[in-house]
Amino acid sequence: MDTRRSDPGRTFPVQAAAVFIVRYAPLAWLRWLRVERARCGRVVYLLDDDIPAVLHASELPLGYRLRTWWRHLRGRKLLAELCDSVWVSTPELARRYADSCPELCEPYDVPAPVKMQGSEAELPAQASYCYHGTRAHRREIEWLLPVVREVQAACPEARFEIFGDWRVRRLYRDIPRVSVRAPMTWPEYLAYSSTVRHQLGLAPCLDTPFNRARSHVKLFDITRFGAAGIYSDAEPYARRIRNGETGWLCPNRQQDWVWMIVRALRDPQECGAVHARALHACRHERGAFPAL
């Protein structure tokens, strides 16, 4: 439920078995939940990033840090009053917030609705690779610039797709065969990534305290659009990707990424095999999930 666009008095059920609050909620909702606490059943706070430490994550845009920190700060006391338990999405978050006795709730892949899905028999576009990051991944977007430039020079048939605003378009404008797509909402992106097809997806993750607490959800995105993935050999991917089987782990050295991308683009059959194993892992291997 999108609490930003709904009135709790009109949209909340008569009785709920459990209420999950993800990251933060508007004060109006938190105050209403406090008054109507008897209708809520169990109330769980789900932390899927290190939101309390976001202000110190200098790799994130300042505006994003300030907005996220303020939303968390103003509702913190009410959340502490309301919530029975805390769920976290990664072992690193569980370690950092051990004083809250959190329960580990690792993300797992949920297939998109059938009406959104492309055909699994549909082949990915050969020599097509992509990075689907947001403004919160600006350092990775900048880090990939020389990598993409070298790959495009080495593979004249290669096409690269990235998401971003005018800043990203300006950054990549001199590199041939690069498509910069405008940012999307999550429902829009889910629909898009369920129908588009690429041969290779990139998931660089620079080694910072904030990134080390992230989860491995890029694996699900990359697999959804039919691609094999290249992932940073660091948290959160180092413990999740089986190198050479469900993806490739690569050190955060740009020349290593150039070599790995070029090699993978020139071997579409191997990319297909890696994607198939990753898809099987996404659908059949699930991490920890607390009992309700």
Regions found by a protein language model. Name each.
Residues 35, 51, 65-85:
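Membrane-proximal helix-turn-helix segments that form the acceptor-binding/catalytic region
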Residues 82-117:
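Donor nucleotide-sugar binding/catalytic pocket of nucleotide-sugar-dependent glycosyltransferases
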Residues 251-252, 266-292:
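A charged, aromatic-enriched C-terminal amphipathic alpha-helix characteristic of glycosyltransferases
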Residues 1-29:
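N-terminal pre-catalytic "stem/leader" segment of glycosyltransferase-like enzymes
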Residues 37-57:
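Active-site proximal beta-strand in glycosyltransferases
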Residues 139, 187-224, 230-239:
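Nucleotide-sugar-dependent
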Residues 241-254, 262-269:
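Conserved acidic donor-binding segment of nucleotide-sugar-dependent glycosyltransferases
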Residues 1, 109-195:
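Conserved catalytic-core segment of nucleotide-activated headgroup transferases in glycan assembly
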